[in-house]
């Protein structure tokens, strides 16, 4: 046995349909396209979205909404996360750099602190935005809020 004698396994390959190669092939004549009509002609291509003449779905449904190019998408971080960070690393100041080092945000993200959970540590917190409840909780614990 050598490379020139190799053949594919029995039944693993099928012979290709050779359409339009005369009547002896069994696929000559109309070449599986039927008789006449637009679909039998050369260059026929089904139009994308065409539904046989009925009003297509993309024209039946209304247009709605838009994408606001000025939207700022904040990365939300709760005060209970700040509490855990302060306890684990004995921090008094939590800013963007500390959140990046801890892996909560990437350098391009904008941060908003939310008021879910409880905060007992006295912290100086730096962020781009704060919810009212988060701001109140940080100040109630004796901390300060710095908006960037």
Curated annotation (Swiss-Prot):
Pfam families documented for this protein: Ribosomal_L27A
GO-annotated molecular function: rRNA binding; structural constituent of ribosome
Record carries keyword NAD: no
Bias-annotated ranges (Gly residues): 21-31
Any GO BP annotation: translation
Listed Basic residues bias regions: 33-44
Region Disordered, residue ranges: 1-51
Stretches of the chain forming a coiled coil according to its record: none
Known role: Binds to the 23S rRNA.
Subunit structure: Part of the 50S ribosomal subunit.
Family recorded in the similarity comment: Belongs to the universal ribosomal protein uL15 family.
The protein's name in its UniProt record: Large ribosomal subunit protein uL15
Record organism: Parabacteroides distasonis (strain ATCC 8503 / DSM 20701 / CIP 104284 / JCM 5825 / NCTC 11152)
């Amino acid at each position: 046995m050598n490379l020139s004698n190799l053949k594919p396994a029995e039944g693993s390959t099928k012979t290709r349909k050779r359409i339009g190669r005369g009547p002896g092939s069994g696929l000559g004549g109309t070449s599986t396209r039927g008789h006449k009509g637009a679909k039998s002609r050369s260059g026929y291509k089904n139009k994308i979205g065409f539904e046989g003449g009925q009003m297509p779905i993309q024209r039946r449904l209304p247009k709605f909404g838009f994408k606001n190019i000025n939207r700022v998408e904040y990365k939300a971080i709760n005060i209970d996360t700040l509490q855990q960070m302060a306890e684990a690393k004995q921090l008094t100041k939590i800013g963007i750099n500390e959140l990046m080092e801890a892996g909560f945000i990437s350098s391009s993200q904008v941060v908003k602190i939310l008021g879910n959970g409880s905060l007992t540590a006295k912290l100086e917190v730096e962020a781009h935005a704060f919810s009212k409840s988060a701001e109140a909780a940080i100040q109630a614990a004796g901390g300060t809020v710095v908006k960037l």
